[in-house]
Amino acid sequence: EREQAAKVAQCLRDDGWELASHSWGHLWMGVSGDPQNPYKISDERFYTDTDKWANEVETLIGPTDIYIYPNGNDIADWHPYTDENYRYQYLASKGFRYFCNVDASKPSWIQMGHDYLRMARRNLDGYRLYEDMIQEDPAKKRLSDLFDSSQIFDPSRPTPVTWSYGQTQNETPAEETTASQQ
């Protein structure tokens, strides 16, 4: 399967596609808003996930400098990344230079740093389409500058569309048994 996946990735690249990292485990990589626990996951899980992506995915699809934050959860607030942000430093050390979060509060924004570009993206999925379609306040519609969601949303789709990030995403994984523990 890995060999076939690598061939597919190469075909996509040959056709002009840019591939990106969306992490290995789709974890909340970034800030939590809790002053006692500023990040959603531990540093160890952050480093492990980043390394697993490099070892398990990058080896198949080739190098990329684009990082699309899982769940849109950025590693910093709106202020520019700094050398003190060790998560940014680690991602940069892995070759990432373009960072994309999810921020539907504005049509778009871009931040250019000394050696990175950071931008918001809008998620165009079934959940966002549904939310935009049922929103009655025109000022709160997030996609109306692109299209009328009610013209795209399939009326045969079950509604309401709900979203859950799941219960296990930020839990500490079970400890692995090593040979020395057996």
Residue locations for each model-derived region?
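Histidine-centered divalent metal-coordination motifs
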Residues: H22, H26
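C-terminal active-site subregion of NodB/CE4 polysaccharide deacetylases
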Residues: G30-Q182
